[in-house]
Amino acid sequence: DLMRTSDALTVATGAPLKRVRDAGNNVQQGFHRLGSVVVEIVTAPSMHPGPASLWGFVLNVKDIYAVANHVGPDVLSIPKPAVQAGKLIATFRSSVGLGVPLALMGQDTN
């Protein structure tokens, strides 16, 4: 539930909901800004009711290709176009054992 989770985040952090985006297919995204951090809350009809849960983290990096080349393809997927225009995304492989899904996002400089 987007509003329930958003309200809980606002109570815990003082950061109000800044924007809600309809992402299509009944998926909604809500955004909170905590300083330089953007927290994205996502909900969809296929999500089970219950308490809010953490799906994963996305970190913005200056040069996503440099990070991908540094850690290698066994650790991080090859950067590909993200849903956000002009952005690239790469995900850490589950075999790395981070426990929570982690992705990196950077500008598409091509």
Question: Where are the language model's segments positioned?
Answer:
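Vicinal oxygen chelate
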Residues: 1, 18-40, 48-110
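Short acidic/polar capping segments at secondary-structure boundaries
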Residues: 1-3, 23-24
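Short helix/strand-bridging catalytic loops that position acidic/His residues to coordinate divalent metals
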Residues: 23, 45-48
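Short, structured motif recognition centered on aromatic/hydrophobic residues
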Residues: 2, 6-9, 15, 32, ...
